[in-house]
Each structure stands twice: as structure tokens, then as C-alpha cells.
UniProtKB/Swiss-Prot annotation:
EC number: 2.1.1.61, 1.5.-.-
Keywords, ordered alphabetically: Cytoplasm, FAD, Flavoprotein, Methyltransferase, Multifunctional enzyme, Oxidoreductase, S-adenosyl-L-methionine, Transferase, tRNA processing
InterPro entries, A to Z: FAD-dep_OxRdtase, FAD/NAD-bd_sf, SAM-dependent_MTases_sf, tRNA_MAMT_biosynth_bifunc_MnmC, tRNA_S-uridine_synth_MnmC_C
Region (tRNA (mnm(5)s(2)U34)-methyltransferase), start-end ranges: 1-269
Domain of life: Bacteria
Classification lineage: Bacteria, Pseudomonadati, Pseudomonadota, Gammaproteobacteria, Alteromonadales
Annotated protein name in UniProt: tRNA 5-methylaminomethyl-2-thiouridine biosynthesis bifunctional protein MnmC
Species assigned in the record: Shewanella frigidimarina (strain NCIMB 400)
Cofactor(s), names only, from the UniProt record: FAD
Segments for region (FAD-dependent cmnm(5)s(2)U34 oxidoreductase): 287-697
Short name of any one Pfam family annotated for the protein: DAO
SUPFAM superfamilies: FAD/NAD(P)-binding domain (SSF51905)
Catalyzed chemical reaction(s): 5-aminomethyl-2-thiouridine(34) in tRNA + S-adenosyl-L-methionine = 5-methylaminomethyl-2-thiouridine(34) in tRNA + S-adenosyl-L-homocysteine + H(+)
GO MF entry, a single one: tRNA (5-methylaminomethyl-2-thiouridylate)(34)-methyltransferase activity
Localization, UniProt: Cytoplasm
């Protein structure tokens, strides 16, 4: 029986001007333009059966691409999908496209803009302008790791992995269902200078691990010669089919792929990913009403999931997410380790999220005015200098500035050098949360239950019972519950042992006057200061551990007034900071010792300590127990998850961490590596010791 194509192929595909866009590559050999056209046609003709058999969500097509190059092939694919969409709307069919792209060399937005400008692709009347602009709006940076871009109303997700293809591919968690069905390799990837990076046997096996059993692999060449026989043999050996092959799949290769999946799962067995639940139509409950909750609701809604939010207040964003302005910029470290790389990824994604909502017409106060980071004493200056000198940072992430340059950027007198984050700025957190929910409600059923303070949760045969704080009666039962309640994250017996701490923060609101009113950028020194918005600057914030109350504090208000004076004692403009109106806002940030948020399955800490007690009484060698903890899933509460501990940078980290959790809950590819997810695990503080064979106490 003939199958209805997922996307109808346009009979006018040649009108995409493939040869024009591919330029010299196509001119050298018309074979290449034919191959690109063949690949696009194959993608568009993918059948519903192939997708449904390999993915949890209907109409989710997953592609892989080796090489990003100058982005031409991606632009063509976007254009082809859009053209097909006009004939057979993607939104009506709920079709989403996910493309994982691996690029060895660094690519950034400026390089792409320069190339496309020369080619006329950025002319507003060019037929591909919308697609090039969509990619440029993603502000691609030359950093290692995954950068997730959502395009065309999130119908197309591009995960761009930069760095060694092998190193990147091997860190991608194998989703429960979502696998790559089609691969396309750009010409430069199979040239002699690069082929070993892209087509090393270990790399190809990792591609196979991420793919369906009958995935096709099309490698393109721009010269008159065919693809090197060694590459063809490598692909065939690892079980890939050519796009025109009808031979059966290789059982040995399939077994090897499964072995690789099990190997990765065993390597990170201590950090179990959320299992897929049988009732995919059941709404997911979220406790909380801030950035974490709203971001998760939006990411779930984009995957067709219904959501019920329990908010203890009468409106969203009344906790730490209620500030008028929050700074957005990455946390960098001299060694650019996992924490630094994580914050570069999340910062860029948050910026994209906010901008996409603004472009959609949602009202979010924000300004991409950059962030200027300076020292405020000898110790902080030394620490900042180590960061500046520690790496050759991409200029789109940060660059050093002289006092003169800093003054020009800030438009107020800065008498010391600094580090400038050009893509940073500020945004209004509660407006961001409100916009995220409003957008989510246009996609699926997202219901908010206001004034609903959940006092406790109890495991039940049909899920988790939620009890109201008002009369301690059960108000609902849900199969899956995410606790994303900010400062209340540890109030439940299931989460009370999470190793995160609350810190009170009072942010002062000051009127613009004198030189202060001229401030053009966010300043981060001893505290932070934002440019004016709605006739107010924000300056702060205090940092008080385990606060006893959230009342206004005159002492903290006065201390906030001194932060910029202490940072820039030789400048006059800090004297314009007037906090005498006693206008301020107080919130609590939940912070972990290692500065990572917490995300994932809620840990059953009591069960973990019970196992540990057995270990203490055992006469087994410590190495045996160390192996046990390394290979055994840590105890968790099934169907219960946590999302929080965002600290003072929740505006930067919240959206991507929520996106990762949503992907995990839906069995989809995550934008964060398995290593980073392990570092976010709510269990990590205890397991960090147990995995090393150390005592917990």
C-alpha cells in the first residue's frame, strides 16, 4: 500500500536555486547540486511509518549532518521544508524537524554574516533572506559543545555541535526513542585533511549509536572523483545504508550499536534519566510560578504536552523571578571547564528564547546592551585577570577592554580595565515568565491553578497526590510531577535533603538622575547595576544565607547604595545613586555549592543512606562498593522530578535546563551532554563521594 508522504515534495524544488546558493561547489561539478537536491527530496519524502516507529512523538523527523560550512545546505533544507509546508502545513500535522550538526572548525555569526553579505543573501528582497536572518538571530558563537537553535516557530530545531565530532557525539545521551534517520555529509568533511576527524571508525560508530537501524548516509563530494572507498567501507561496516540502497540491515552492526548504547548507559548508570511513562496524554504537573516553571511549561508545550501549573501566588513571577531587571551573561572560569562551558551554552539559549518571544509580539522588557565586568578590589581584579588571560575567548562571548573603551561602552566614567560580554544585557524576569506561559498556551492545554500552595506530596498507586496547604487535603493526582518552586524547593519530605541553600537578595530601585541616567550597559563589579527602564535602575543585591524573613531591610538598602561607590571610588556618577525612597524588592535565590542548578529525577535520599548503611556494616572491600555505586542507578522517586537551584543566574540558566528536562521527559535528544546532566543531578553531592569510594560523613 502506498504511504502518504510526511511532507509533499514540491515539483518546483529547482526554484530554490540550489546551484546559485552552492556557488563554486556546484559550478565545479553539477553532481553536488544533484546530490543536495537528492538529499532534500529524500528528507521530504520520509514516510510517517518510519518516523512513528522510531520516535515517541508523532511526526518528529530527526536528521544528522556532518559539517556546517557556510550554512548553505542548512538554508536550502530550511527553504525546502518551508516550501513543502505551504502545500502541506507542518503545524497542522504537528511535524517537527530535529537536525544534529557536527562541525570540527569554529563557526560564528560574524563569519556567516560576512559570507552571506558578499553573496547577497542578506538583501531583504532575496528569496532566502528569512532563512539566513533566522540563523543569524541565533547568534551562533565559536564555542565547543551544543548550541540549540529553534527556528520557524520551533518547527525546526538545530543542535550545532562544534569541536571534535567524536568527542561531541560520544557525549550525547541515547534517547529512549528519538533516533536519526538520515545523515548528510558536506564535501569538506570527506576531504583528506578532515576525513579522519569526521569518519574515524569510532566516530562513525557513535553516529550509528544515535541512529535508527536502517538510517541512510549520503556523503557528498564536489570534485569529479567519488567518495573515497575507505569512507564508503567504513559507513557500510558500521551498518549505514546508502540513500538508494534497499538491502537489509546488518545484524552485527545493529548489535554493536546496541552495545554502545548500553555502554554509555552503564557509564552513567548512577544518574538515571527519566523513564518514559505509558500515558503520554496525561498532563504533567509543575509546582512553581517562576522562570523555571514557565520555561519548562513552554518546552513541554512545544512537544505537544499538556501542563498544569500550581502557583502559590495570585500571579506568576512573585518569587526570585519577580525582579524588574536581571542581568544575562555567562559565568566564565580561567580553565573554561564544565561550569564555564555550561554557562556559555545556557546564556546563549536564554538570549535566543527571549528574542524569539519578543519577535513573536510578547512584551518582555529587555535590552541587549552588553555587560561590563570589572574588579572592585585587588582580589577581584586578580580573579578577573585570570579569567581574561586563561583562554582565547571568542570575541562574541567576551573581550578585554581598556578604561577608555569601558567608559565609551558604559557612557559613564570607568577608570579601570574590564571584561565585556557583547551579547549580554538585561531582561525582566517576571515578564519573561508570563510571556513563556502565554506562548505555551497557544500550543497546548496549559492550565494555571493560582493561589494553590502545595504543602506535601504522597506517592499513590496512580501517581503523586498533591495536598493543599490550606486544609491539608488532596487536590489532585498526577503521574508526573516537577517541583520547580524556587525557594520552596526543599519544603517537601522528598526534597528536604537536597544540598542547596537559600540566600536572601534585596534589589534596590533608584531613579535616573545626573550622570547615572546616561548609563548604557549593565555593570557587574561589587554587585550589579542596570541601565534605566521605566524610570528606574536596579542595583544590588544583598546576599544573606538562610534568611529569617523577607521584609525590607534599611541596612541592606544602604549597603546597595555603596556598591558602585566602592567599585569606582574615583568616579562621580555613583554619587547619583539615591536609595532614600526605600523602593526595593526582596527574594530568595537557591544556590548549590558548585554553582550548577539541580535538574532531574528526585533522589530518594533515605534509600541512598540505607544502602550506604549496609555498605558500612559490610566486610566487602571498599572497591567493590565503589564499583556498585558506579554501575547501579541511584535510588529515585519514580515520576517525581526537581528543577531549581538556579542561583543568581537563573535568568541565564533556567530556559536551557528546563529544555533539557522536557527533552528527557519526552525521550528526545537533549541539548546537554551526559556529563553535564550528571553535574546537574540532584544526587550529585552524595554520589561524588561514593563514586570515589569515600565516606559520606
Amino acid at each position: 500500500m502506498n504511504k502518504t508522504p510526511l511532507l509533499s515534495v514540491s515539483p518546483n524544488l529547482h526554484e530554490l536555486h540550489i546551484c546559485e546558493l552552492l556557488g563554486n561547489n556546484a559550478n565545479q561539478n553539477s553532481r553536488y547540486s544533484h546530490i543536495v537536491k537528492q538529499y532534500i527530496a529524500e528528507v521530504l519524502q520520509s514516510s510517517d511509518d518510519k518516523i512513528a516507529a522510531t520516535n515517541t512523538q508523532p511526526h518528529l523527523l530527526t536528521l544528522g549532518q556532518l559539517g556546517f560550512g557556510d550554512g548553505h545546505e542548512i538554508i536550502l533544507l530550511l527553504a525546502a521544508l518551508q516550501e513543502a509546508n505551504l502545500q502541506n502545513p507542518l503545524i497542522q500535522q504537528q511535524t517537527r524537524i530535529h537536525i544534529s550538526v557536527f562541525e570540527q572548525g569554529p563557526v560564528n555569526c560574524k563569519q556567516l554574516q560576512h559570507t552571506w553579505q558578499q553573496q547577497g543573501l542578506l538583501d531583504s528582497d532575496h528569496h532566502l533572506f528569512d532563512f539566513t536572518q533566522a540563523l543569524l538571530n541565533g547568534e551562533i558563537a565559536a564555542i565547543e559543545g551544543c548550541q540549540r537553535l529553534s527556528l520557524l516557530q520551533n518547527q525546526i530545531i538545530i543542535d550545532l555541535y562544534q569541536g571534535s565530532p567524536l568527542a561531541q557525539a560520544k557525549t550525547i545521551a541515547t534517547p529512549n526513542k528519538q533516533r536519526i534517520t538520515h545523515w548528510f555529509a558536506l564535501p569538506h568533511t570527506n576531504q583528506e585533511a578532515h576525513s579522519d576527524q569526521y569518519f574515524h571508525q569510532r566516530s562513525v560508530w557513535e553516529y550509528g549509536r544515535l541512529s535508527v537501524d536502517n538510517a541512510t548516509f549520503l556523503a557528498a563530494s564536489t570534485n569529479d572523483e567519488n567518495i573515497a572507498p575507505t569512507i564508503k567501507k567504513q559507513l557500510a561496516f558500521c551498518g549505514f545504508l546508502s540513500s538508494t540502497s534497499f538491502k537489509s540491515t546488518d545484524d552485527i552492526a545493529i548489535a554493536e550499536r546496541n552495545a554502545l548504547r548500553q555502554q554509555l548507559q552503564q557509564q552513567f548508570a548512577y544518574n538515571p534519566l527519566p523513564p518514559l511513562h505509558s500515558n503520554n496524554n496525561s498532563p504533567i504537573a509543575i509546582i512553581g510560578g517562576g522562570i523555571a516553571s514557565a520555561s519548562l511549561a513552554l518546552s513541554l508545550a512545544e512537544r505537544g504536552k499538556d501542563v498544569i501549573i500550581y502557583c502559590k501566588d495570585d500571579t506568576l513571577g512573585q518569587g526570585a523571578s519577580g525582579n524588574k531587571q536581571g542581568a544575562i551573561y555567562p559565568l566564565l572560569t580561567p580553565e573554561n571547564g564544565s561550569l564555564s562551558q555550561f554557562f556559555q551554552q545556557v546564556f546563549l539559549y536564554s538570549r535566543r528564547r527571549i528574542q524569539a518571544l519578543v519577535d513573536d509580539g510578547y512584551d518582555i522588557g529587555h535590552e541587549w546592551c552588553g555587560v561590563l565586568h570589572t574588579g572592585f578590589d585587588q582580589r577581584s581584579q586578580t580573579r578577573l585577570d585570570k579569567i581574561i588571560d586563561g583562554q582565547a575567548w571568542p570575541s562574541e562571548i567576551a573581550f578585554a577592554v581598556s578604561p577608555h573603551q569601558a567608559t565609551q561602552l558604559a557612557n559613564v566614567d570607568i577608570d579601570k580595565p574590564g571584561f565585556y560580554y557583547p551579547l549580554g544585557g538585561w531582561a525582566c524576569p517576571f515578564e519573561f515568565a508570563q510571556a513563556s506561559i502565554a506562548k505555551a498556551q497557544t500550543l497546548t492545554k496549559v492550565r494555571i491553578v493560582y493561589n494553590s500552595d502545595i504543602s506535601s506530596l504522597e506517592s499513590h498507586s496512580s501517581g503523586w497526590q498533591l495536598f493543599s496547604a490550606e486544609d491539608n487535603t488532596p487536590i489532585a493526582t498526577h503521574e508526573q510531577v516537577v517541583i520547580a518552586s524556587g525557594a520552596q524547593l526543599t519544603q517537601y519530605k522528598q526534597t528536604k535533603n537536597l544540598q542547596i541553600t537559600g540566600f536572601r537578595g534585596q534589589v534596590s530601585h533608584v531613579p535616573p538622575q545626573g550622570e547615572l541616567a546616561q548609563l548604557n550597559t549593565v555593570i557587574c563589579a561589587n554587585g550589579y547595576l542596570t541601565p534605566q527602564h521605566n524610570q528606574l535602575h536596579c542595583v544590588g543585591a544583598s546576599y544573606v544565607k538562610d534568611p529569617q524573613h523577607l521584609d525590607f531591610c534599611p541596612i541592606e538598602q544602604h549597603e546597595n547604595s555603596l556598591k558602585m561607590k566602592q567599585s569606582f571610588p574615583n568616579s562621580n556618577w555613583p554619587n547619583d545613586i539615591d536609595v532614600s525612597n526605600n523602593d526595593a524588592r526582596v527574594g530568595v535565590r537557591m544556590v548549590s555549592r558548585d554553582h550548577f542548578p539541580v535538574m532531574g529525577c528526585a533522589p530518594d535520599v533515605e534509600a541512598l543512606f540505607t544502602r550506604y548503611a549496609v555498605q558500612q556494616q559490610s566486610k566487602d572491600k571498599p572497591s567493590l562498593w565503589q564499583h556498585y555505586w558506579q554501575t547501579t542507578p541511584a535510588p529515585i522517586y519514580d515520576g517525581l522530578y526537581v528543577l531549581g537551584g538556579l542561583g543568581s543566574r537563573g535568568l541565564s540558566s533556567g530556559p536551557l535546563v528546563a529544555e533539557c528536562l522536557a527533552a528527557n521527559l519526552c525521550g528526545e535528544l537533549s541539548p546537554l551532554s551526559v556529563e553535564l546532566q550528571a553535574l546537574l543531578s540532584p544526587n550529585r553531592m552524595w554520589l561524588r563521594k561514593l563514586l570515589k569510594g569515600k565516606a559520606l560523613m
